[in-house]
């Protein structure tokens, strides 16, 4: 008997403008067994390593195992039919995670692209990439700060999308290493900047810029 096994990418979530998160799973007959690594896809045959997204992991399991378990449960009796329908519904529900849907989440995704060169959320970025991006963003902010801090942009606003994107990026990366209370303040300021931005233009070429 030949056992077909290996690794596969599945669990696509948070897609926008051709970018999305997936998880690389060990599989048997294409059925995911356990997650191996997270990936952020930035274009055709391009991407970068990312931390594992729990949404992607759940989606990867639910979209493959869910229908199979649901179908099997339906043959066990009336209670199994109910359980089977529940499995199928739960599997289908993860499709809502496939794309970035709300306007606020879309603006955050766009600002991620402008600031970091990837739409990946900062908490999924690997440490080495954060360590490379943060001094670059802080240096860029130093050139355009005009005596303000990134939090000042959140409080007082700006008509300059470049300043908004860089301030947003500095705040989000800073939040990763701050104590919880300060991190929450930085994230709140970044969210305020995103809420105030309506029209975004490309801010140069990031290392993972999508075509």
Where do the PLM segments sit?
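A composition-biased, non-transmembrane "mature-region" signal
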Residues: 1-211
């Amino acid at each position: 008997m030949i056992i077909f096994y290996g690794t596969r990418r599945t669990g696509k979530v948070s897609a926008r403008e051709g970018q999305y998160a997936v998880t690389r799973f060990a599989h048997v007959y294409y059925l995911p067994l356990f997650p191996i690594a997270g990936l952020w896809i930035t274009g055709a045959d391009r991407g970068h390593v990312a931390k594992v997204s729990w949404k992607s992991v759940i989606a990867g399991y639910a979209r493959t195992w869910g229908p199979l378990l649901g179908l099997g449960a339906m043959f066990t009796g009336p209670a199994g039919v109910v359980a089977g329908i529940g499995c199928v519904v739960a599997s289908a529900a993860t499709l809502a995670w496939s794309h970035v849907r709300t306007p606020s989440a879309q603006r955050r995704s766009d600002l991620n692209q402008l600031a970091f060169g990837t739409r990946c959320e900062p908490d999924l970025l690997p440490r080495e990439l954060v360590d490379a991006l943060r001094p670059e963003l802080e240096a860029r902010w130093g050139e355009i700060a005009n005596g303000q801090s990134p939090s000042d942009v959140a409080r007082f606003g700006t008509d300059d999308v470049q300043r908004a994107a860089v301030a947003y990026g500095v705040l989000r990366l800073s939040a990763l290493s701050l104590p919880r209370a300060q991190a929450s303040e930085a994230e709140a300021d970044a969210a305020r900047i995103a809420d105030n931005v309506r029209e975004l233009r490309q801010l140069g070429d990031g290392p993972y810029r999508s075509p």
